[in-house]
Amino acid sequence: MPDATGVIARNPFEEAPSRLNQYTPEEAAALQARLEKKLGPEYISSRPGAAGLKVHYLAADKCINLANEVFGFNGWSSSIQNIQIDFVDESPNTGKVSLGLSVIVRVTLKDGAYHEDLGYGHIENCKGKAAAFEKAKKEATTDALKRALRNFGNVLGNCIYDKDYISKVSKLKTVPSKLDVGDLHRHPDFAPIKKEPMRVKPSLEDDDLPPNPSIAGRNTSTNSAADMDAEFGSDVFDEADFNVGEGEYPDGIVAEDTQKRHQPPTPVGRPNAHLNLPKHALGAQASGNQHVVTPSKPERPMNLAPAGRQIPNQALNNRPFPPPAQNQYTNQRQSVPLPGSNGGLQNGRSIPLGQRASNGMATGSDAGAQVPIKQEHGAKQPNPAPQNTAVPATPGINGQGPPVVGFLSARGADMLRENPHSAATVAPAFNPHAESPSIRKTAGVDHTKSIPISKPMLAGSASPLSNQTRDFINPSAEMHRKIGAPSGSVVGGPMNRGPSVSSYRPLTRPNVDPKAAAQNNTAAANRMAPNMNGKRPPLNDVTNETLPGGNGCTPAPGLNDPKRAKYDESMSAQQHQQQHQH
């Protein structure tokens, strides 16, 4: 009915028309294929049940995540249709509550299809009614939701009721998942700060370098044909070189032999000539040309290096090159060509294309703009046919001769590093036969030769004594150990330390004259015994008692004392005292 403003308001008691989004046949088929798959062992949980058996189930959180994954977060919904309380009992003595209830939940998809099922929850002997109803209703709702979702297919839990499947999948082992901190939703105040990668600042010597061929190759798609020719020079990347049509991919086509094709003439006004590049060189340039030699990047010892092309002055960031006498390349790295080294091969190896002088090479100022490539020193080669241009020999770094290459000692290497040119004649050479005094060597073995070691060679040398035990002995456990003295049983002590090999000398017997030995034996036999019994006299006891008539402690005379008066037992005690007085 219209209101005061004349606008007809909708009846709030009427149900709103449902907006259904029907699945297309393709979506329905894809959804059906997902629902028919069975779950992996990582989704299935188990708990102990009756009679010692395990009860397998699908946790509620995993079930909801599976529904969102299959249907989408906005592709399904759930609603509680009915809650029925079955019983509520309260104990009159303890006041504890026991109840049970059932809940019916409906799960509806976005196209209107739905399933509903029953869930049950209960609690026994709860202290309060509120806690009892909360626990029972949540349990029943969760149970009803899982049972309603399993009606859609195996992937939502229906496969758990297959005993044959459970018996097989429960034997599979799962690897615990690792927590990825980057996937966590963090609060902005506690989120880790992402550090930007450090940008390498280009050095001053790289300001006038030619552009990277890989970067320049990517920019050619947006440039015109004239700009491409001006930047790369001539028709280096022409279709004739690749032998590829307009609709073909050049990386999958094998280029024909470059020696059988005739090189196109050099157009007038273009600074560079056409270079015949081999197949591997073309592939290297297409993939980034990582072997380009620049003043800041030394060359690599490869048999075939990329071609050193000449780059026009107008293409180098619109900055002309300085004259050849002030060229930066000649100040940092100059090639050292040898006489007659313009051939195609050197000692059976191919020379990089940048070292050859072709018929179409430019001369004069263009030669100074070319990126030179260092050439190896090899044997003399036959002089090839005369070329149109000749590359003059250039000195080494800073106008000096090339550094001397050889084997030097460690001290010589340090001297050569500080002054590579003047120290080459003064630095000591490496001596492979030098003997170091700090290295111990086995006695009796010739270390200057490589020969097998036999047992007679080692007969004169003794191996160091090995330790008697490796177990640690507590020094306090020795009862007769002197305070401050090292223990005799400690591993590595001076008592157990074996003699070194270098200082060991075998024991030798002294040369004894047999006549002198016989005289010594005769003199020892005629020597008188120390006492009448021919034995060592026994030790006497010492006392500190004061004898009568004496001033101090006088030790009692021993039995074998020569100053003691000898008497017979039959003598009277009177005579014995008189002898002592005398």
UniProtKB/Swiss-Prot annotation:
Extent of Basic and acidic residues compositional bias: 194-204
This protein's UniProt keywords: DNA damage, DNA recombination, DNA repair, DNA-binding, Nucleus
Localization, UniProt: Nucleus
InterPro entries: DNA_recomb/repair_Rad52 (IPR004585), Rad52_fam (IPR041247), Rad52_Rad59_Rad22 (IPR007232), Rad52_Rad59_Rad22_sf (IPR042525)
Residues covered by region (Disordered): 194-226, 310-400, 485-582
Gene Ontology annotations for the cellular component aspect, listed alphabetically: nucleus
A molecular-function term among this protein's GO annotations: DNA binding
DNA-binding region (UniProt annotation): 146-150
Comp. bias intervals (Low complexity): 516-529
Subunit composition and interactions: Part of a complex that includes RAD51, RAD52 and RAD59.
Protein name listed in UniProt: DNA repair and recombination protein radC
Source organism of this protein record: Emericella nidulans (strain FGSC A4 / ATCC 38163 / CBS 112.46 / NRRL 194 / M139) (Aspergillus nidulans)
Lineage: Eukaryota, Fungi, Dikarya, Ascomycota, Pezizomycotina
